[in-house]
């Protein structure tokens, strides 16, 4: 396992369990790939992905989420701070998915996209009262 994960000692922001698709791109690779955000906070994500990516790699990420009957998104740049191999099994113990879990720390996020992140992870009521600008129309 590269890096380490100790939730009590290293986590600076509370986590919210979510299940959202993302598109990501390694900053040095033109190929778009998909993954799933498992949990999120104001400071980063836990994602599950098939591709083996090195700790320290920066990713350009687009998070897709539903708002009413439409799919909207927000973008972040994040760095992989830890990774571990990960697999899932069905109720009979048969493995049906194998990939990696990655701990990501946000490096860049715009004010508008941070507002969208806050909306997604639970600050919906407060965020709707105080949007960053009147021009925001998802």
Model-inferred region functions:
Residues 1-40, 48, 118-138:
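N-terminal helix initiation/capping motif
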Residues 13-15, 40, 54-56, 71-73, ...:
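Short coil/turn motifs at beta-sheet boundaries
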Residues 15-17, 31-32, 69-79:
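Short coil-to-beta-strand transition motifs
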Residues 21-26, 57-74:
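Short conserved beta-strand and strand-loop elements enriched in small hydrophobics
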Residues 27, 42, 82-89, 111:
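Short, conserved beta-turn/loop elements at beta-strand boundaries and strand-helix junctions
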Residues 48-54:
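Short, surface-exposed secondary-structure edge patches
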Residues 88-138:
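C-terminal output/interaction extensions
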């Amino acid at each position: 396992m590269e890096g380490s994960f100790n939730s009590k000692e290293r986590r600076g922001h509370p986590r919210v369990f979510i299940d959202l698709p993302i598109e990501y791109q390694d900053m040095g690779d033109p190929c778009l790939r998909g993954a799933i955000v498992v949990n999120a906070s104001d400071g980063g994500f836990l994602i599950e992905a098939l591709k083996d990516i090195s700790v320290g790699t920066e990713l350009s990420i687009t998070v897709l989420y539903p708002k009413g009957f439409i799919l909207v998104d927000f973008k972040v740049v994040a760095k992989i701070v830890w990774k571990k191999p990960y697999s899932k099994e069905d109720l009979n113990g048969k493995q049906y998915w194998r990939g990696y879990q990655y701990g990501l720390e946000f490096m860049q996020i715009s004010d508008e996209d941070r507002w969208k992140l806050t909306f997604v992870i639970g600050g919906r009521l407060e965020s709707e009262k105080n949007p960053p600008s009147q021009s925001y129309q998802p």
